[in-house]
């Protein structure tokens, strides 16, 4: 046979063993496997779900005057009213299926 070059640049007079025409390739799996059972559905409750989310607004105070004014404001306002101003509630009702 003619001399052939290998990857390293060395000339060989015979082809590599892995290049033989009658070499058998190992069979690979076709990707099919036993089917998995479908996940069981969870039972839904009869009542609806209410989600309440509360968060506090981010209030930035930049000067001491604002702090003094804020304290005066706090003294004039009922604490329950202030809580209503500073907190917001979000209610979501999810109907039962």
Curated annotation (Swiss-Prot):
Detected in testis, melanoma and bladder carcinoma. InterPro entries: SPAN-X_fam. Residues 1-47 are annotated as: Disordered. A motif (Nuclear localization signal) lies at residues 37-45. Its main location: cytoplasm. Keywords: Cytoplasm, Nucleus. It is found in: Cytoplasm; Nucleus. One of its GO terms (cellular component) is cytoplasm. It comes from the Eukaryota. Belongs to the SPAN-X family. This is Sperm protein associated with the nucleus on the X chromosome C.
